[in-house]
Structures are given as C-alpha cells and as structure tokens.
Amino acid sequence: MIKNPFISVISQEEKEENKGSVEYQILSFTNKIRRLTSHLELHRKDFLSQRGLRKILGKRQRLLAYLSKKNRVRYKELISQLDIREPKTR
C-alpha cells in the first residue's frame, strides 16, 4: 500500500530525469498543487495555503509557457501525461 501517491511519482521520475529540467520542475509543482488542493478541500479557511497555491500555479504557468515556446512537442506530451489543461492564451 502506497501511503502517499505523490511521492511515488516523484521517486520514479527522479531516476529518469534531471531535477533541474523544466519537465521535472513542472511535475513537482503539479504534485504540490494536487496536494494543496486536497488540503484546501478539508480546510477552506486556510488562507496562507491558498496564497501558496496561487504562487505555485503562477510558477507552473510560467514554466509551461517557456516550454511551449522552446519545444512544442515536449510541451504537448507533458500536458497529456500530467492531465493538465492548456492555459488560455490572451
């Protein structure tokens, strides 16, 4: 039984990729976002966690924009693997 599924995903990806790569950073931000989202479902008035969630969402959005400019194919693969919606373009 896996106690925390978020950590198991990171440990599997850790072996394959560099921790400094854009994909790994987006993966770790996505896991943090999912963990914070589940926390906020239980604790709706935790405003510091809400602020942290917004900051992490912004960081991930900037990294996704960078990756989409640099390599569109890797961006599409990562979006489909992590089951993330594409951000709206302005």
Curated annotation (Swiss-Prot):
Presence of the UniProt keyword Ribonucleoprotein in the record: yes
An annotated Gene Ontology molecular function: structural constituent of ribosome
Record key words, sorted: Chloroplast, Plastid, Ribonucleoprotein, Ribosomal protein
Assembly and binders: Part of the 30S ribosomal subunit.
Domain of life: Eukaryota
Family the entry assigns: Belongs to the universal ribosomal protein uS15 family.
Species this protein is from: Nandina domestica
Annotated CDD domains: Ribosomal_S15p_S13e (cd00353)
Protein name: Small ribosomal subunit protein uS15c
GO process terms (BP): translation
Primary subcellular site in the record, as a coarse category: plastid
Protein location: Plastid, Chloroplast
GO cellular component labels: chloroplast; ribonucleoprotein complex; ribosome
